[in-house]
């Protein structure tokens, strides 16, 4: 029976998806507020950088995986315009519902899909850009998900992974205090849920570092993989291409 990690716990692979789903069902309604508090608003700048690097043009087809509350999909839909096609997807129904409603409130009409990134329900070589922001670390089989992203992106297209990463070494101790003391406290006070935010902190520590993720993307068949460290490596944006 194969094991994987759920935060710092070892669990059966078949259990992880359900446990992660429970976390995001719990945090969905407060997700944006908590992101602002946790990052001091920096998550908006990280996403803006990702949007700029994506360089979506009118007519592009874009897939946003684990798109959550729709920040990236909203920007991409406006850039792709009426001739483009932007899909907001998430494996979690609660998160997808929040994202869909926020897009509608912003006047953005774009399709949504309940989607497991390890089994993407789209044809080969369909999208110009595929993005996943703060979602890859929660996936049970990251290698399968990356291979699926590579499968559905067109030759010449980009696969982009925005994710928490390995912070600059001199900041590690302070970052640990923030992650394991302050973050669960914020989760308790603002969202009434310390445990979910403790899991989020643990999942960040268990996620591959910058070089390891680069190698995983290359092993998935992506070329010219590069990464950009943001905020001293708290977050990294990895970009790979299908040639």
Swiss-Prot record:
Keywords: Menaquinone biosynthesis, Methyltransferase, S-adenosyl-L-methionine, Transferase, Ubiquinone biosynthesis. GO terms for molecular function: 2-methoxy-6-polyprenyl-1,4-benzoquinol methyltransferase activity; demethylmenaquinone methyltransferase activity. S-adenosyl-L-methionine binds at residues 69, 90, 116-117. Gene3D superfamilies: Vaccinia Virus protein VP39 (3.40.50.150). GO terms for biological process: aerobic respiration; menaquinone biosynthetic process; methylation. InterPro entries: SAM-dependent_MTases_sf, UbiE/COQ5_MeTrFase, UbiE/COQ5_MeTrFase_CS. It comes from the Bacteria. Its EC number is 2.1.1.163, 2.1.1.201. Pfam families: Ubie_methyltran (PF01209). It catalyses: a 2-demethylmenaquinol + S-adenosyl-L-methionine = a menaquinol + S-adenosyl-L-homocysteine + H(+); a 2-methoxy-6-(all-trans-polyprenyl)benzene-1,4-diol + S-adenosyl-L-methionine = a 5-methoxy-2-methyl-3-(all-trans-polyprenyl)benzene-1,4-diol + S-adenosyl-L-homocysteine + H(+). Pathway: Quinol/quinone metabolism; menaquinone biosynthesis; menaquinol from 1,4-dihydroxy-2-naphthoate: step 2/2; Cofactor biosynthesis; ubiquinone biosynthesis. It is an enzyme of class 2 (transferase). Methyltransferase required for the conversion of demethylmenaquinol (DMKH2) to menaquinol (MKH2) and the conversion of 2-polyprenyl-6-methoxy-1,4-benzoquinol (DDMQH2) to 2-polyprenyl-3-methyl-6-methoxy-1,4-benzoquinol (DMQH2). NCBIfam families: MenG_MenH_UbiE, PRK00216.1-1. Belongs to the class I-like SAM-binding methyltransferase superfamily. MenG/UbiE family. This is Ubiquinone/menaquinone biosynthesis C-methyltransferase UbiE. It comes from Ralstonia nicotianae (strain ATCC BAA-1114 / GMI1000) (Ralstonia solanacearum).
């Amino acid at each position: 029976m194969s094991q994987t990690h759920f935060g710092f716990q070892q669990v059966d692979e078949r259990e992880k998806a359900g446990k992660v789903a429970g976390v995001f069902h719990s945090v969905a309604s407060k997700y944006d507020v908590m992101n602002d508090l946790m990052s001091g608003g920096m998550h908006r700048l990280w996403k803006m950088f990702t949007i700029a690097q994506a360089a979506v043009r009118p007519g592009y087809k874009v897939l946003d995986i684990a798109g959550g509350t729709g920040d990236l999909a909203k920007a991409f839909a406006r850039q792709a315009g009426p001739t483009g096609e932007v899909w907001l997807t998430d494996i979690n129904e609660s998160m997808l519902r929040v994202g869909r409603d926020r897009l509608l409130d912003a006047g953005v009409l774009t399709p949504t899909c309940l989607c497991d990134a390890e089994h993407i329900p789209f044809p080969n070589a369909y999208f110009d850009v595929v993005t996943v922001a703060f979602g890859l670390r929660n996936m049970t089989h990251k290698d399968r998900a990356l291979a699926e992203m590579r499968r559905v992106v067109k030759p010449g297209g980009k696969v982009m992974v925005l994710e928490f990463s390995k912070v600059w070494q001199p900041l590690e101790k302070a970052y640990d205090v923030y992650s394991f003391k302050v973050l669960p406290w914020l989760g308790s006070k603002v969202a009434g849920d310390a445990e979910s935010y403790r899991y989020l902190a643990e999942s960040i520590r268990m996620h591959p570092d910058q070089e390891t993720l680069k190698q995983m993307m290359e092993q998935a068949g992506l070329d010219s993989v590069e990464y950009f460290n943001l905020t001293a490596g708290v977050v990294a944006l990895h970009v790979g291409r299908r040639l």
